[in-house]
């Protein structure tokens, strides 16, 4: 496999399968909320990736297939990564866990992106730096966290099943 994006995507899918198998008999509302976060992250990232490319702030390189300016592998990573990230959250809010988990996630995401820059899969321009990425990840990860708990509360309270037709 010559494409690192593909390797990362396959890894994300395999981890996703393992977590879904682990959680399949537990709280279905947690899985629905996690899927919501995965979809949100994928859409949000698609918009941001395109804005970044158009403005010259950042760009992804060496994708197999591009949708607008975004490699298909990034869609896969965002969706499955967002779901996996959400499944780690406890069903009931735990502020201490959340603060530590959010901080660890921000640091990890920023570090991993800096490594993507180092190996040539991602690039910055027009003054964008790793610090800017840190701030962006802080906002995105906080939104993912809040989306998970908002969605979980909605699915638990209303018994709304968005996976089934009305």
Q: What does each model-found stretch correspond to?
A:
Residues 1-166:
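Aromatic-rich, lipid-facing transmembrane alpha helices and their immediate juxtamembrane interface loops
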């Amino acid at each position: 496999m010559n494409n690192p994006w593909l390797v990362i995507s396959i890894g994300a899918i395999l981890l996703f399968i393992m977590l879904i198998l682990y959680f399949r008999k537990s709280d279905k509302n947690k899985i629905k909320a996690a899927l919501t976060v995965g979809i949100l992250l994928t859409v949000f990232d698609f918009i941001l990736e395109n804005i970044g490319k158009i403005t010259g702030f950042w760009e992804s390189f060496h994708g197999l297939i591009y949708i607008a300016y975004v490699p298909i592998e990034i869609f896969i990573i965002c969706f499955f990564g967002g779901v996996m990230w959400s499944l780690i959250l406890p069903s009931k809010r735990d502020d201490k866990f959340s603060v530590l988990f959010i901080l660890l996630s921000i640091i990890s995401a920023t570090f991993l992106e800096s490594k993507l820059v180092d190996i040539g899969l991602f690039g910055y321009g027009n003054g964008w730096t790793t610090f800017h990425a840190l701030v962006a990840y802080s906002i995105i990860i906080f939104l993912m966290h809040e989306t998970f708990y908002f969605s979980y509360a909605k699915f638990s309270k209303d018994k709304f099943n968005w996976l089934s037709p009305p």
